[in-house]
UniProtKB/Swiss-Prot annotation:
Gene (UniProt): fadM
Family: Belongs to the proline dehydrogenase family.
Protein's pathway: Amino-acid degradation; L-proline degradation into L-glutamate; L-glutamate from L-proline: step 1/2
Protein name, per record: Proline dehydrogenase 1
Chain positions recorded as substrate binding sites: K95, R283, R284
Organism name: Bacillus subtilis (strain 168)
Any one biological process term the GO annotation gives: proline catabolic process
Residues that, per the record, bind FAD: M130, Q158, K182, G183, A184, T221, H222
Pfam families: Pro_dh
Catalytic residue list: D129, R179
Length: 302
C-alpha cells in the first residue's frame, strides 16, 4: 500500500515544484549527489578511489517545454565533458522525456544525437534509462535507431514486464548493452508482474538469456538472491568478468557495493544529481518505505 502512495506522489507536479525550490534538504542527500555537476564529480571521485565505477545522471524527466529540454541536453553534454576532464571511471545515463520526448520524438532524437556526438568525441558510454510503460515502445525504437550510429550506447530492460524476454531476443542483432532492472514504476497487471516472486524469477531468466547470448549485461539489483544467482551463473558458464557488471544506486547498500568490488566484480554506482530530484527520490522510498525515515529526519533538523 505504501509503495503505491509514494509512486503516486512521485508523479505530483505541485510537490515536485516545491521540492525543487526547497532543495535536497528533505532527506534526499542520501540518494542524490548534490545539485551540480561539480558535486557529482566529487562524489564519483570518491567512489572511484574505493574501486567503484559510476554512471552519472542529471535528474529530470517529462520536460514541459523546448527550453527545459534544451537545458537538460546541454547539462548532459557538460557532464560528459566533466567525466573526460576529470578522467572519471564513469558513464552517463539519461531519460528521453527529459530531452523532449513528450514534446516530439524528433526533438528528443535531435538532442540525443547531439549528446551522443559529444560522448563519442570523449569516448564516454551512454545508457538510455527506461521510464514508464507509456514511453516503452518509443524508447526501444529510438535505441535501435541510435545504436547503429553509436556503438557505446545501452538501454534498460525492466524485469517486471511480461514482454521483456521477447524484447531482448528482438534486439540480438544489435548486440545490445543492457542494464537489467526490476522496474520502479507503477504499472498495470496487464503488462507487469504484480508480485515480487514473479518479477524475481523473470529477472533471473532475463539475466541468463542476456549473459548466455554473449552480450554485455549490467545486473542492477540490491537483492542478494539475484546477486548470488548471477555469480553462480557466470561461474558455471565461465563467463568472463569483462562481459558483465553489477549496478546499485548511490546511497543504497554502500558497503555491499565495496564488497563486490573487492571480490573482483565490476561494480557501478548510479549517481544522480540536480535540483529536479523529487520523483526519483519518491521511487526510492517506494522501493523501501523505511527510507521515509530520512525524510522526517531532514525536516526535523530545520
Amino acid at each position: 500500500m505504501l509503495r503505491h502512495v509514494f509512486l503516486f506522489l512521485s508523479q505530483n507536479k505541485t510537490l515536485t515544484k516545491f521540492a525543487k525550490a526547497y532543495g535536497t534538504r528533505l532527506g534526499a542527500r542520501r540518494f542524490v549527489a548534490g545539485d551540480t555537476i561539480e558535486s557529482a564529480v566529487k562524489t564519483v571521485k570518491r567512489l572511484n578511489r574505493s574501486g567503484l565505477c559510476a554512471t552519472i545522471d542529471y535528474l529530470g524527466e517529462y520536460a514541459a517545454s523546448e527550453k527545459e529540454a534544451n537545458q537538460v541536453a546541454e547539462e548532459c553534454k557538460k557532464a560528459i565533458q566533466a567525466i573526460a576532464e576529470h578522467q572519471l571511471n564513469s558513464e552517463l545515463s539519461l531519460k528521453l522525456t527529459s530531452i523532449g520526448l513528450d514534446l516530439s520524438e524528433e526533438l528528443a532524437l535531435t538532442h540525443l544525437r547531439a549528446i551522443l556526438s559529444v560522448a563519442k568525441q570523449y569516448d564516454v558510454a551512454v545508457t538510455i534509462d527506461m521510464e514508464d510503460y507509456s514511453h516503452y515502445e518509443q524508447t526501444l525504437s529510438i535505441y535501435r535507431q541510435c545504436k547503429q550510429e553509436f556503438e557505446k550506447l545501452g538501454t534498460v530492460i525492466q524485469a517486471y514486464l511480461y514482454r521483456a524476454a521477447e524484447d531482448i531476443r528482438k534486439m540480438r542483432d544489435l548486440k545490445p548493452n543492457l542494464r537489467l532492472v526490476k522496474g520502479a514504476y507503477k504499472e498495470s497487471a496487464a503488462v507487469a508482474f504484480p508480485d515480487k516472486r514473479g518479477t524475481d524469477l523473470h529477472f533471473q531468466s532475463l539475466i541468463k538469456l542476456q549473459l548466455l547470448s554473449g552480450n554485455y549485461t549490467a545486473v542492477a539489483t540490491h537483492d542478494d538472491d539475484i546477486i548470488a544467482f548471477t555469480k553462480q551463473l557466470v561461474a558455471e558458464h565461465q563467463i568472463p568478468a569483462s562481459q558483465f557488471e553489477f549496478q546499485m544506486l548511490y546511497g543504497i547498500r554502500p558497503e555491499r557495493q565495496k564488497e563486490l568490488a573487492k571480490e573482483g566484480y565490476r561494480m557501478r554506482v548510479y549517481v544522480p544529481y540536480g535540483t529536479d530530484w523529487f520523483s526519483y527520490f519518491m521511487r526510492r522510498i517506494a522501493e523501501r518505505p523505511a527510507n521515509a525515515a530520512f525524510v522526517l529526519k531532514g525536516i526535523l533538523k530545520k
